[in-house]
C-alpha cells in the first residue's frame, strides 16, 4: 500500500484537501466551502444534466407521491 496521501482540490476554492477520515468536510476544505456549494444547489445554480427534465412540467404525469 502506498504511503502517499491522496489530496483533492476543494470544488469551491481549489485548496488542497487530504483524503483522510480527519478531513471532516471532504471534498471541501471547510464548512464555509461546503455551505457555499449547498447554497448553489439550493438556488438551482447547479443541476445534474438530464434529457428527461420535462417530466416535472407535465401535470398529467404522476410522480407517485402526490395526493389527489
From Swiss-Prot:
Q: What is the lineage of its organism?
A: Bacteria, Pseudomonadati, Pseudomonadota, Gammaproteobacteria, Pasteurellales
- List the coiled-coil residues: none
Q: Which GO terms describe its biological process?
A: regulation of DNA-templated transcription
Q: Name one GO molecular function term.
A: zinc ion binding
The positions annotated for binding Zn(2+) are 10, 13, 29, 33
The gene name reads yacG
Tagged with keyword GTP-binding: no
Organism from which the protein derives: Haemophilus influenzae (strain PittGG)
> What does this protein's UniProt record list under function?
Inhibits all the catalytic activities of DNA gyrase by preventing its interaction with DNA. Acts by binding directly to the C-terminal domain of GyrB, which probably disrupts DNA binding by the gyrase.
Task: Name the chain's protein.
Answer: DNA gyrase inhibitor YacG
Q: Which InterPro entries match?
A: DNA_gyrase_inhibitor_YacG, Znf_NHR/GATA
Tell me which NCBIfam families the record gives. Answer: PRK00418.1
Could you say which protein family the record assigns here?
Answer: Belongs to the DNA gyrase inhibitor YacG family.
- All disulfide bonds of the chain are none
